[in-house]
């Protein structure tokens, strides 16, 4: 059994890690990510809270995708230090389709929220998936994060009533209403999500306004391109 130290990733703000045995994942997941069966483990890497953005800003990356570039660099450094010479493949960020939320559910990180962003009791909705790494090493598997969805003990669900698009008013998310409202020039959700910022779970981990604007500007660009 090969043991590794994730502390360098923690310091970089990539403070969520889950190790899966590829052979134990649902067959369609393993087949899509590692069709030739060349690796033994999948490492899901994420971030929770504000530290990653602070590290990215300090790195001064003036690129279109600074978080992805920072993540690739830190993961490469970690691999060189912890698993030198081990065969590996970084499938995300990249062009390979990856079911990030499905992996998040298996890790115990992801519970569905009314506003369709994953939520958990430790970080609220203020976490994200940053890398999916395949390695040919016999790493110890992670124990899934325990705990039920915090939404089950939130009877008032202020995220529903806060949505200015009424996209959650029927207790089911309306992508059409959300997209139509975000496209409006005077929309309160062009570079944020009012429902998400109204969620009362772990507000101390909320991203700063610049990080929120960065993320939602990217999603708005996709909306304006494809809708």
Residue ranges, per PLM feature:
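Non-ligating segments of multi-cofactor redox enzymes
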Residues: 1-227
């Amino acid at each position: 059994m090969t043991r590794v130290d994730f502390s360098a990733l923690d310091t970089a703000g990539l403070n969520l890690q889950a190790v899966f045995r590829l052979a134990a994942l649902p067959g369609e997941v393993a087949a899509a990510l590692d069709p030739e069966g060349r690796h033994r483990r999948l490492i899901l890497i994420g971030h929770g809270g504000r530290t990653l953005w602070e590290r990215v800003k300090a790195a001064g990356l003036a690129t279109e995708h600074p978080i992805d570039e920072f993540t690739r660099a830190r993961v490469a450094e970690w691999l060189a230090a912890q698993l030198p010479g081990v065969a590996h493949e970084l499938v995300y960020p990249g062009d390979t389709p990856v079911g990030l939320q499905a992996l998040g559910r298996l890790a115990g990180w992801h519970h569905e929220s009314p506003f369709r962003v994953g939520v958990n009791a430790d970080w609220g909705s203020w976490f994200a998936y940053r890398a999916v790494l395949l390695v040919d090493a016999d790493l110890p598997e992670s124990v899934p994060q325990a705990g039920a969805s915090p939404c089950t003990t939130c009877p008032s669900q202020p995220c529903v009533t806060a949505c200015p698009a009424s996209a959650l008013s029927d207790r089911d998310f309306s992508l059409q209403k959300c997209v139509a409202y975000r496209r409006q020039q005077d929309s309160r959700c062009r570079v944020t999500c009012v429902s998400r910022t109204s969620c009362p779970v772990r507000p101390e981990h909320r991203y700063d306004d610049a990080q929120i604007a960065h993320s939602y500007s990217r999603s708005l660009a996709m909306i304006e391109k494809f809708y």
